[in-house]
C-alpha cells in the first residue's frame, strides 16, 4: 500500500471480512511491535471511525510528537457511540490508560472493562464498570449486571430498562426472575415484552415457562402453539416447557380425580410439535418413566389394574444410566414397591447413597422414598438458595427433576 492512492485502494479492496477494522488493527499491532510506527498509524487510519483504532492512533501520534492531531483524535473518539464496539486486545490498554489521563470520560473505562472481561479478569472489569458512574447507556448496565449476582444484578437490569428498552433488556430481566424462581414477576414482565416483541421466541420461551410455573397451563400451551422456534443444536427448551405444562396439568387433574382428562394431558405431553425447534428422537432414546408413572396412577384411578401394572412394569424395565443418577430412578423404586417387590425396591434405593454419595438429587430421592418429606423439603430450599451454574459447569442436567419435585409436592 506504499505506492500511492491506487496501491492503497487495491490493498483495502482485499480486506473483505465482516469486521475490517479488526484486520487493520491486527496488522497495525504487528507493525507497532517491530517499531514501524508510521506504518501502524497508516493502517489504523484505514479502520475509520472505530473508537479503539482512534485511541491507539492518537497514542502513537502523541509519542511521535504530533500532539495537535492526537488531541483532535481523542475528541473524535469521545464523540463516537460505543454501540457495537467490543474491544478485546490487551495491547489496547496502554493507549486507553494514556487517553484517560489526557481526556477522561466514562467510555474509556467501559472499553477497558470489556478488554479485561474478554481476558477473564471479571473482578477488574466490574471495578472499572462501577467507576463509570451513572451514564445514559443501557449496554453498560447490562454488562455490569452480567458480572453481578442477586439484587445488585437486578438493580442494573432495571436501570438498563429505564434508559433503553429492548428485547435484550426484557430477556435479561425475565431470565433473572426465572433464575430466582419469582415466577409471577417473570410472567408479568414476559407479558409486557411479548406484546412489544411478539415474534421473539427467546422472550416467548421464558414467558411460556413463567406461565407454566404459575399454573397457567392452557395459556402456556396456546402461546407455544403460535411460536416458531428456529431449529438449532440443543434447542430443547420449547419442547421441555410444552411437556412440563401438560404433565403439571395432568398432576392437578389426578389430584382432582379427573382421570380421563389426566390421560389426555399425558398423551399430549408425548407429542413433539415441529414448531418448537426440535425433532423427536427414536422411541428407545426417550425416557417415558414419568409419563408412564402418571398414566399408571390414572389407570388405577379408573379401575384398570392390568394397565396400571403393565405401565409400572415398563418403568421397572427401563435401563438407568450407570454414570449419572437420574431423578426418574425414584420412579423405578416406587414402581417396584407398588408391584409388591418391596425388597428389590429397598435394595435399589439403598444403593443410591453408595453409588452416588455426593449427588444431591440422589439424596433427595432417597428421602422421598423413605417418607422423609421434611428432610427433602429442606434440601430443596438449599438448592433454591444456590447460584445457578453455567451450562458448561454442569456435567449432567436432569430434565425430569423439577417435574418429579412437583409430583411429590402435590402428593403431600
Q: Residue ranges of each PLM-predicted region?
A:
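Structural signature of alpha-solenoid helical repeat junctions
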Residues: 19, 49, 104, 136, ...
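Structural motif corresponding to the intra-repeat A-B loop/turn of tetratricopeptide repeats
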Residues: 34, 64, 119, 147, ...
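Flexible helix-coil transition and linker loops at the boundaries of alpha-helical arrays
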Residues: 11-18, 83-85, 96-102, 159-162, ...
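Residue-level signature for tetratricopeptide repeat
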Residues: 30, 60, 115, 143-147, ...
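"A position-specific structural signal for the A-helix of alpha-solenoid helical repeats
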Residues: 26, 56, 111, 139-143, ...
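Amphipathic alpha-helical segments of tetratricopeptide repeats
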Residues: 49, 78-79, 133-134, 162, ...
Amino acid at each position: 500500500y506504499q505506492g500511492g492512492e491506487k496501491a492503497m485502494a487495491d490493498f483495502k479492496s482485499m480486506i473483505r471480512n465482516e469486521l475490517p477494522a479488526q484486520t487493520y488493527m491486527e496488522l497495525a499491532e504487528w507493525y507497532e511491535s517491530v517499531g514501524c510506527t508510521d506504518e501502524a498509524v497508516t493502517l489504523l487510519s484505514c479502520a475509520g471511525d472505530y473508537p479503539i483504532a482512534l485511541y491507539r492512533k492518537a497514542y502513537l501520534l502523541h509519542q511521535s510528537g504530533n500532539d495537535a492531531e492526537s488531541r483532535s483524535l481523542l475528541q473524535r473518539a469521545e464523540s463516537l457511540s460505543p454501540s457495537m464496539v467490543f474491544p478485546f486486545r490487551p495491547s489496547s490498554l496502554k493507549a486507553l490508560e494514556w487517553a484517560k489521563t489526557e481526556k477522561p470520560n466514562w467510555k474509556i473505562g467501559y472499553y477497558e472493562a470489556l478488554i479485561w472481561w474478554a481476558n477473564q479478569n471479571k473482578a477488574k472489569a466490574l471495578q472499572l464498570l462501577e467507576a463509570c458512574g451513572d451514564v445514559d447507556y443501557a449496554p453498560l448496565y447490562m454488562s455490569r449486571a452480567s458480572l453481578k449476582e442477586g439484587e445488585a444484578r437486578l438493580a442494573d437490569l432495571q436501570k438498563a430498562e429505564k434508559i433503553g428498552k429492548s428485547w435484550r433488556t426484557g430477556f435479561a430481566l425475565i431470565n433473572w426472575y426465572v433464575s430466582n424462581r419469582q415466577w409471577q414477576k417473570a410472567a408479568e414482565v414476559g407479558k409486557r415484552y411479548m406484546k412489544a416483541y411478539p415474534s421473539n421466541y427467546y422472550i416467548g420461551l421464558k414467558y411460556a415457562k413463567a406461565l407454566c410455573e404459575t399454573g397457567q397451563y392452557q395459556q402456556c400451551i396456546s402461546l407455544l402453539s403460535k411460536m416458531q422456534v428456529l431449529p438449532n443444536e440443543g434447542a430443547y427448551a420449547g419442547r421441555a416447557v410444552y411437556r412440563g405444562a401438560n404433565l403439571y396439568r395432568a398432576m392437578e387433574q389426578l389430584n382432582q380425580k379427573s382421570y380421563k382428562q389426566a390421560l389426555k394431558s399425558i398423551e399430549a405431553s408425548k407429542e413433539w410439535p415441529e414448531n418448537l425447534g426440535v425433532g423427536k428422537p427414536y422411541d428407545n432414546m426417550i425416557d417415558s418413566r414419568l409419563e408412564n408413572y402418571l398414566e399408571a396412577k390414572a389407570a388405577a384411578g379408573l379401575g384398570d389394574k392390568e394397565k396400571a401394572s403393565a405401565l409400572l412394569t415398563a418403568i421397572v424395565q427401563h435401563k438407568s444410566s450407570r454414570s449419572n443418577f437420574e431423578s426418574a430412578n425414584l420412579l423405578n423404586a416406587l414402581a417396584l414397591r407398588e408391584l409388591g417387590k418391596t425388597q428389590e425396591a429397598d435394595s435399589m434405593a439403598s444403593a443410591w447413597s453408595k453409588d452416588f454419595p455426593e449427588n444431591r438429587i440422589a439424596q433427595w430421592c432417597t428421602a422421598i422414598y423413605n417418607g422423609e418429606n421434611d428432610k427433602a423439603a429442606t434440601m430443596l430450599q438449599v438448592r433454591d438458595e444456590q447460584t445457578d451454574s453455567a451450562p458448561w459447569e454442569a456435567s449432567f442436567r436432569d430434565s425430569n427433576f423439577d417435574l418429579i419435585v412437583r409430583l411429590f409436592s402435590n402428593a403431600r
